[in-house]
């Protein structure tokens, strides 16, 4: 049976259909303000002069309060030569639409902030207060948190960088206090030919623990790592490429190892709330006199029962003849390195935001940047903060869908 050919009318003709393509957003010009930090023990600055130079050369304006980079060993002249506007007027800095801080927003900042500004800063969950969130909401602030900014690999680059600094610094500090002839043991952290290596216990196999382990092994120390997450212990060994001694946190095994160690590093992490105390005071009492405890997780309560918060000015105290170093924000003690690491993340992000037409336009496409938003135009968009402070939560996706582009 033959197929019947369709009859095509002579009036039929083809017409070009218009393809609906999205119009590319015009690039935006950013006006950024960086105030001098007054928060306790905060020495970092969020953008180094080299990053400011790149931003200025791309047509953006950066206004920096005088001496903002002083604690990171960057002078006003460094920033001026990079193209920044230097001012002694704090009010002038806080007039800018985008404010970047290296310390979390605190109560003293609230009167200075303007309506509808964008603030990029750490959140510091352990110190955040409900009143601060309410004040930000009242001024319809859009806020991004350092801790929430994510990259294409799914990691949190600023958190990772600060953790790497803290882990490496922990071993340098432990070596310094062990060598101290006054209260330390007068030993070299590591080992030399013919002398048994010093023994280091690291509690926690996250980024801090891994960085501390790398530093200790590089110095020649004998390292033992504890963590209750077997996956993290396996990942640690894979990343190191070295079969380091590992164990889950079993109190009897941990107590036995602490009795003979020269240095113990607390590097546990907790996504919500306080880290657990895994080293009791009785365990510390049995440690060798002159040994050192570096409690990196003191900002989340500390994992040693004997830990008490100290400062960069008075970093240590002696308890049961054991030196305790319990300074929160260790990275701030290495301010220039930490500032460089933060700047390496923020500068490319700011350029990308500007090239895509500003923050609102960028949020449509960049899910990593979207993850960093915890408040959008006065609406709390972070579920954890909403539950923790009993405040109304609004899905950021809904806010973007209903906003005009």
What is each PLM-predicted segment?
Residues 147-173, 177-188, 303-405:
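Adenosine-phosphate binding glycine-rich loop
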Residues 1-31, 37, 107-198, 327:
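Glycine/serine-rich phosphate-binding loop and adjoining beta1-alpha1 elements at the start
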Residues 35-36, 40-70, 181-266:
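Glycine-rich phosphate/diphosphate-binding loop of Rossmann-like nucleotide-binding domains
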Residues 41-46, 108-112, 271-279, 303-308:
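Glycine/threonine-rich flexible loop motifs
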Residues 17-135, 139-141:
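An N-terminal-biased, well-structured beta-alpha scaffold segment characteristic
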Residues 126-153, 282-326:
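Rossmann-fold NAD(P)-binding glycine/threonine-rich loop
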Residues 101-126, 259-260, 273-293:
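Rossmann-fold NAD(P) dinucleotide-binding segment
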Residues 83-94, 105, 246-262, 268-285, ...:
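A structured beta-alpha segment of the ubiquitous adenosine-cofactor-binding alpha/beta core
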